[in-house]
Protein backbone atom coordinates (compact mmCIF):
# COMPACT_ATOMS: atom_id res chain seq x y z
CA UNK A 1 0.00 0.00 0.00
CA UNK A 2 1.47 3.37 -1.07
CA UNK A 3 0.54 6.64 0.62
CA UNK A 4 1.71 9.83 -1.12
CA UNK A 5 1.87 13.29 0.47
CA UNK A 6 3.10 16.59 -0.89
CA UNK A 7 2.89 20.29 -0.15
CA UNK A 8 2.94 21.64 3.38
CA UNK A 9 1.39 18.55 4.97
CA UNK A 10 3.92 16.89 7.25
CA UNK A 11 4.78 13.29 6.24
CA UNK A 12 4.56 12.41 9.94
CA UNK A 13 0.77 12.92 9.72
CA UNK A 14 0.52 10.32 6.96
CA UNK A 15 2.70 7.92 8.94
CA UNK A 16 0.47 8.27 11.97
CA UNK A 17 -2.66 7.54 9.92
CA UNK A 18 -1.12 4.45 8.34
CA UNK A 19 0.07 3.08 11.68
CA UNK A 20 -3.34 3.57 13.30
CA UNK A 21 -5.64 2.49 10.46
CA UNK A 22 -3.80 -0.25 8.57
CA UNK A 23 -2.33 -3.47 9.90
CA UNK A 24 1.32 -3.65 8.91
CA UNK A 25 4.61 -5.41 9.55
CA UNK A 26 6.85 -2.51 8.60
CA UNK A 27 6.71 0.97 7.05
CA UNK A 28 9.29 2.50 4.72
CA UNK A 29 9.43 6.27 4.32
CA UNK A 30 10.94 7.74 1.16
CA UNK A 31 11.42 11.36 0.14
CA UNK A 32 12.32 12.90 -3.20
CA UNK A 33 12.81 16.39 -4.60
CA UNK A 34 10.61 17.18 -7.59
CA UNK A 35 12.47 20.40 -8.35
CA UNK A 36 14.71 20.59 -11.42
CA UNK A 37 17.33 22.48 -9.40
CA UNK A 38 19.69 20.61 -7.06
CA UNK A 39 20.14 22.36 -3.73
CA UNK A 40 22.80 21.64 -1.08
CA UNK A 41 21.99 22.66 2.49
CA UNK A 42 24.41 25.10 4.09
CA UNK A 43 25.52 23.83 7.51
CA UNK A 44 25.88 27.41 8.69
CA UNK A 45 22.16 28.03 8.27
CA UNK A 46 20.41 29.21 11.40
CA UNK A 47 16.98 28.13 12.72
CA UNK A 48 15.50 31.33 11.32
CA UNK A 49 17.37 31.41 8.00
CA UNK A 50 17.73 28.26 5.92
CA UNK A 51 20.20 28.55 3.04
CA UNK A 52 21.35 26.28 0.24
CA UNK A 53 23.88 26.22 -2.60
CA UNK A 54 22.61 25.74 -6.16
CA UNK A 55 24.54 22.76 -7.58
CA UNK A 56 25.14 22.42 -11.32
CA UNK A 57 27.01 19.12 -11.12
CA UNK A 58 28.46 16.65 -8.63
CA UNK A 59 32.04 15.97 -9.73
CA UNK A 60 33.21 13.75 -6.85
CA UNK A 61 31.41 12.06 -3.99
CA UNK A 62 33.22 9.47 -1.84
CA UNK A 63 34.49 8.55 1.60
CA UNK A 64 38.26 8.61 1.96
CA UNK A 65 40.31 5.88 3.59
CA UNK A 66 40.76 8.02 6.71
CA UNK A 67 36.99 8.40 7.00
CA UNK A 68 36.26 11.85 5.59
CA UNK A 69 33.24 12.33 3.33
CA UNK A 70 34.61 14.27 0.36
CA UNK A 71 32.62 16.05 -2.33
CA UNK A 72 33.60 18.29 -5.22
CA UNK A 73 30.57 20.24 -6.43
CA UNK A 74 30.21 22.67 -9.30
CA UNK A 75 28.20 25.50 -7.74
CA UNK A 76 26.12 27.92 -9.79
CA UNK A 77 27.47 31.03 -8.07
CA UNK A 78 30.93 30.07 -6.79
CA UNK A 79 32.31 27.55 -9.28
CA UNK A 80 33.96 24.32 -8.17
CA UNK A 81 34.05 23.81 -4.41
CA UNK A 82 35.34 21.30 -1.88
CA UNK A 83 32.99 20.00 0.80
CA UNK A 84 34.17 17.73 3.64
CA UNK A 85 31.63 16.05 5.89
CA UNK A 86 28.85 18.17 4.35
CA UNK A 87 30.54 21.52 5.04
CA UNK A 88 32.09 23.82 2.45
CA UNK A 89 35.85 24.16 2.80
CA UNK A 90 36.82 26.27 -0.19
CA UNK A 91 35.42 27.56 -3.50
CA UNK A 92 37.58 28.47 -6.47
CA UNK A 93 35.89 31.86 -6.93
CA UNK A 94 37.02 33.35 -3.61
CA UNK A 95 39.67 31.03 -2.15
CA UNK A 96 42.30 33.73 -2.62
CA UNK A 97 40.57 35.87 0.03
CA UNK A 98 40.86 33.07 2.58
CA UNK A 99 44.47 32.02 1.93
CA UNK A 100 45.94 35.48 1.47
CA UNK A 101 44.34 36.78 4.66
CA UNK A 102 45.45 33.64 6.51
CA UNK A 103 49.13 33.94 5.57
CA UNK A 104 49.34 37.73 5.78
CA UNK A 105 47.82 37.65 9.28
CA UNK A 106 50.97 35.90 10.48
CA UNK A 107 53.38 37.98 8.43
CA UNK A 108 51.98 41.20 9.90
CA UNK A 109 53.34 40.15 13.30
CA UNK A 110 56.66 38.87 11.96
CA UNK A 111 57.76 39.20 8.31
CA UNK A 112 60.38 36.45 8.55
CA UNK A 113 59.60 33.51 6.28
CA UNK A 114 62.60 31.24 6.16
CA UNK A 115 60.57 28.19 7.15
CA UNK A 116 56.86 27.53 7.67
CA UNK A 117 54.69 24.63 8.80
CA UNK A 118 51.15 24.07 7.55
CA UNK A 119 48.90 21.78 9.56
CA UNK A 120 45.93 20.68 7.46
CA UNK A 121 44.90 22.76 4.46
CA UNK A 122 44.40 19.85 2.07
CA UNK A 123 43.07 22.05 -0.74
CA UNK A 124 46.57 23.51 -1.12
CA UNK A 125 45.60 27.18 -0.98
CA UNK A 126 47.73 28.07 2.05
CA UNK A 127 50.70 26.17 0.60
CA UNK A 128 50.32 28.02 -2.71
CA UNK A 129 50.13 31.35 -0.89
CA UNK A 130 53.31 30.58 1.08
CA UNK A 131 55.07 29.71 -2.17
CA UNK A 132 53.91 32.95 -3.78
CA UNK A 133 55.16 34.86 -0.72
CA UNK A 134 58.61 33.30 -1.28
CA UNK A 135 58.91 31.24 1.88
CA UNK A 136 62.21 29.38 1.87
CA UNK A 137 60.95 25.98 3.02
CA UNK A 138 57.47 24.67 3.79
CA UNK A 139 56.62 21.52 5.75
CA UNK A 140 53.03 20.57 4.97
CA UNK A 141 51.45 18.17 7.47
CA UNK A 142 48.24 16.71 6.01
CA UNK A 143 46.14 13.84 7.34
CA UNK A 144 44.33 12.85 4.15
CA UNK A 145 46.23 12.60 0.83
CA UNK A 146 42.97 11.89 -0.97
CA UNK A 147 41.82 15.45 -0.27
CA UNK A 148 45.00 16.77 -1.85
CA UNK A 149 44.65 14.46 -4.86
CA UNK A 150 41.02 15.31 -5.57
CA UNK A 151 41.75 19.03 -5.26
CA UNK A 152 44.71 18.70 -7.63
CA UNK A 153 42.31 17.04 -10.08
CA UNK A 154 39.38 19.46 -9.90
CA UNK A 155 40.65 22.58 -8.11
CA UNK A 156 44.14 22.80 -9.58
CA UNK A 157 44.03 26.61 -9.71
CA UNK A 158 43.94 26.68 -5.91
CA UNK A 159 46.92 24.48 -5.07
CA UNK A 160 48.83 24.97 -8.32
CA UNK A 161 50.53 21.60 -7.76
CA UNK A 162 52.12 22.81 -4.53
CA UNK A 163 53.08 19.25 -3.56
CA UNK A 164 55.46 19.13 -6.54
CA UNK A 165 57.40 22.27 -5.63
CA UNK A 166 60.97 21.83 -4.40
CA UNK A 167 60.35 24.11 -1.42
CA UNK A 168 57.47 21.94 -0.14
CA UNK A 169 57.84 18.75 1.89
CA UNK A 170 54.60 16.80 2.43
CA UNK A 171 54.25 14.77 5.61
CA UNK A 172 51.20 12.50 5.52
CA UNK A 173 49.31 11.31 8.59
CA UNK A 174 48.57 12.69 12.04
CA UNK A 175 50.28 16.09 12.15
CA UNK A 176 50.59 16.18 15.92
CA UNK A 177 52.33 12.82 15.93
CA UNK A 178 54.63 13.93 13.12
CA UNK A 179 55.74 17.16 14.78
CA UNK A 180 57.06 15.21 17.76
CA UNK A 181 60.17 14.50 15.67
CA UNK A 182 60.65 18.14 14.61
CA UNK A 183 63.55 19.97 16.26
CA UNK A 184 62.96 22.84 18.67
CA UNK A 185 62.74 26.40 17.29
CA UNK A 186 62.29 25.30 13.68
CA UNK A 187 59.56 27.52 12.21
CA UNK A 188 59.10 31.24 11.69
CA UNK A 189 55.42 30.69 10.92
CA UNK A 190 52.95 27.92 11.73
CA UNK A 191 49.56 27.89 9.99
CA UNK A 192 46.90 25.70 11.59
CA UNK A 193 44.20 25.06 8.99
CA UNK A 194 42.01 22.53 10.80
CA UNK A 195 38.24 22.46 11.17
CA UNK A 196 36.88 25.11 13.49
CA UNK A 197 34.78 22.71 15.60
CA UNK A 198 35.21 21.91 19.29
CA UNK A 199 37.02 18.64 18.57
CA UNK A 200 39.81 20.45 16.72
CA UNK A 201 39.92 23.20 19.33
CA UNK A 202 40.49 20.56 22.01
CA UNK A 203 43.02 18.78 19.79
CA UNK A 204 45.01 21.97 19.26
CA UNK A 205 44.85 22.83 22.97
CA UNK A 206 46.13 19.38 23.87
CA UNK A 207 49.10 19.74 21.51
CA UNK A 208 49.85 23.43 21.96
CA UNK A 209 52.98 22.72 24.00
CA UNK A 210 54.44 20.86 21.00
CA UNK A 211 53.55 23.74 18.69
CA UNK A 212 55.22 26.26 20.99
CA UNK A 213 58.31 24.04 21.13
CA UNK A 214 58.85 23.99 17.36
CA UNK A 215 58.12 27.71 16.91
CA UNK A 216 61.12 30.04 16.89
CA UNK A 217 61.35 32.88 19.41
CA UNK A 218 59.33 35.74 17.90
CA UNK A 219 57.78 33.19 15.55
CA UNK A 220 54.05 33.40 14.84
CA UNK A 221 51.29 30.81 14.93
CA UNK A 222 48.08 31.53 13.02
CA UNK A 223 44.89 29.47 12.93
CA UNK A 224 41.62 29.78 11.11
CA UNK A 225 39.08 29.98 13.93
CA UNK A 226 35.73 30.22 12.14
CA UNK A 227 33.18 32.99 12.00
CA UNK A 228 32.76 35.36 14.93
CA UNK A 229 29.42 36.39 13.42
CA UNK A 230 28.00 32.86 13.18
CA UNK A 231 29.73 31.02 16.06
CA UNK A 232 31.15 33.58 18.52
CA UNK A 233 31.56 31.07 21.37
CA UNK A 234 33.66 28.85 19.13
CA UNK A 235 35.95 31.74 18.18
CA UNK A 236 36.25 32.72 21.84
CA UNK A 237 37.33 29.16 22.66
CA UNK A 238 40.14 29.40 20.09
CA UNK A 239 41.22 32.79 21.42
CA UNK A 240 41.34 31.42 24.96
CA UNK A 241 43.68 28.63 23.81
CA UNK A 242 46.07 31.14 22.24
CA UNK A 243 45.96 33.59 25.12
CA UNK A 244 46.61 30.84 27.66
CA UNK A 245 49.69 29.64 25.76
CA UNK A 246 51.12 32.87 24.32
CA UNK A 247 49.59 35.65 26.39
CA UNK A 248 48.58 37.49 23.23
CA UNK A 249 46.44 37.11 20.14
CA UNK A 250 45.42 39.27 17.21
CA UNK A 251 42.24 38.60 15.25
CA UNK A 252 42.03 39.17 11.49
CA UNK A 253 38.82 39.16 9.49
CA UNK A 254 37.75 38.85 5.87
CA UNK A 255 34.37 38.37 4.20
CA UNK A 256 34.16 35.13 2.18
CA UNK A 257 31.19 35.24 -0.25
CA UNK A 258 30.91 31.44 -0.59
CA UNK A 259 30.75 31.15 3.21
CA UNK A 260 28.22 34.01 3.32
CA UNK A 261 29.95 35.49 6.36
CA UNK A 262 33.16 37.07 7.60
CA UNK A 263 35.88 34.59 8.59
CA UNK A 264 38.44 35.01 11.34
CA UNK A 265 42.10 34.13 11.80
CA UNK A 266 43.90 34.30 15.14
CA UNK A 267 47.65 35.02 15.29
CA UNK A 268 49.96 34.91 18.31
CA UNK A 269 53.65 35.74 18.60
CA UNK A 270 55.99 33.53 20.60
CA UNK A 271 57.51 35.89 23.16
Regions found by a protein language model. Give the residues of each.
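Active-site lining segments that contact anionic ligands and/or coordinate catalytic metals
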Residues: 67, 79, 218, 262-263
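Short, glycine-/Ser/Thr-/acidic-enriched flexible segments
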Residues: 77, 228, 256
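The AdoMet/dcAdoMet-binding core of the Class I SAM-like
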Residues: 3-42, 90-245, 259-261
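Short beta-strand elements
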Residues: 249-250
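Residues at the C-termini of beta-strands that transition into short coil/loop
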Residues: 76, 174, 253
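Non-catalytic substrate-recognition/targeting regions of SAM-dependent transferases
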Residues: 2, 20-84
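Core SAM-dependent methyltransferase catalytic element
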Residues: 245, 255-271
Amino acid sequence: FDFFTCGKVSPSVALKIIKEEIQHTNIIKKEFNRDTIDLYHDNYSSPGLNKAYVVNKVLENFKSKVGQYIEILDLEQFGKALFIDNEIQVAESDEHLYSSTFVNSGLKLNPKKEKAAIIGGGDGGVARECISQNFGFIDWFELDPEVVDVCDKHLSKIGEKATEKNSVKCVWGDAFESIKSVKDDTYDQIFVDLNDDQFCIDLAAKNMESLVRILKPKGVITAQVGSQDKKPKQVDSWLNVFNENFGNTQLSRVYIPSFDCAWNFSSSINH
